[in-house]
Amino acid sequence: MAQVSMKQLLEAGVHFGHQTKRWNPKMKPYIFGARNGIYIIDLQKTVRYFKSAYQFIRETVQNGDKVLFVGTKKQAQEAIREETARADQFYIDNRWLGGMLTNFATIKKSIERLKKIEVMAQDGTYELLTKKEALNLEREREKLEKTLGGIKGMNKLPGAIFVIDPKKETIAVKEARKLGIPVVAVVDTNCDPDDIDYIIPGNDDAIRAIRLFAAKMADACIDGAQAREAAIRAESDKAETDKVEVEGKGEAPAAEAAEVVESADKA
C-alpha cells in the first residue's frame, strides 16, 4: 500500500487550516492547535485517516467500480484532470450540474449527444452543413465537453466519489449520500465532516496539498486495478489447469478400455 509521510504532508502545507474565525467546531478533533490566527491540522490523524481512505478507494476499484474525482475550484482542476487520466478514472473539474448523479439517466443523454457531435466533426458531416450550423454545433460540443468531458466514458454510477473541498461541492456530496455512494474527501477546518464517509483532514486550498492527495488517490485506483487484473489472471490460469486435469483423467480410462479390447481380440 502506498503511504503518505509526515515530510510529504509538511512540504505540501497540508497542516495549514483556515483562520480561527472561519472554522467548523465539528473539526475540533482533527486540529492540533492554532498559530498566528490559523488553525494547524493534526497530521498524525491525517496519516491515519488517509490510510483508511486509500484502502477503501483501492478496494472499490479492485471490485470493478470506478471512482469519480470532483474538484471544481481553480486550484484543483489541473491536478484532477491529470491524475484521473493517469488512473483511468472519471472527473468533474468545471461545474457540478444538479442531478449529475441523482438524474444520471438525463445526464447520459447529454453525454450521448456530445459523442454524436464528436463523430459528426470527424466523419465529414460538418462539411455538409452551412457555416452557421457547423459553428453552432461546435459551440454546443465545446459547452458539453467543458461540463461532461470528464465523464464521457461513465456508463453507470461510480462506486465512490473523491472530493476536494466538500464545502464547495455540497451538491455533489448530497447527491452521493442520497444514492448511498460513499464519499471520500479532503476536509479542511471550515468543513462539516459528518457528511463524509472517509475523511482526510487537510488543507484543501493549497495547490501542492491538492495535487498530493489527488495523486495518492489515483495511486490507490491504480493499485486496485492491478490487483483486479492479477485476480482475473489467477482465476483464468486455475480454470485452464483444471481443464487440463479433467481432460487428462478422461484420456486414462479410454486408454485402459483400448487395452482390454486389444486383449480380448488376441484371446
Curated annotation (Swiss-Prot):
InterPro entries: Ribosomal_uS2, Ribosomal_uS2_bac/mit/plastid, Ribosomal_uS2_CS, Ribosomal_uS2_flav_dom_sf
UniProt similarity note: Belongs to the universal ribosomal protein uS2 family.
Transmembrane segments annotated in the record for this chain: none
Single GO MF descriptor: structural constituent of ribosome
CDD domains in UniProt: RPS2
Start-end of Basic and acidic residues biased regions: 233-250
Source organism superkingdom: Bacteria
Protein name as annotated: Small ribosomal subunit protein uS2
A Pfam family matched in the record: Ribosomal_S2
Keywords in alphabetical order: Ribonucleoprotein, Ribosomal protein
One GO biological process term: translation
Annotated Gene Ontology cellular component terms: cytosolic small ribosomal subunit
Disordered, as annotated region: 233-267
Gene3D superfamilies the record matches: Glucose-6-phosphate isomerase like protein, domain 1, Helix hairpin bin
Lineage: Bacteria, Pseudomonadati, Thermodesulfobacteriota, Desulfuromonadia, Desulfuromonadales
Biased composition (Low complexity): 251-261
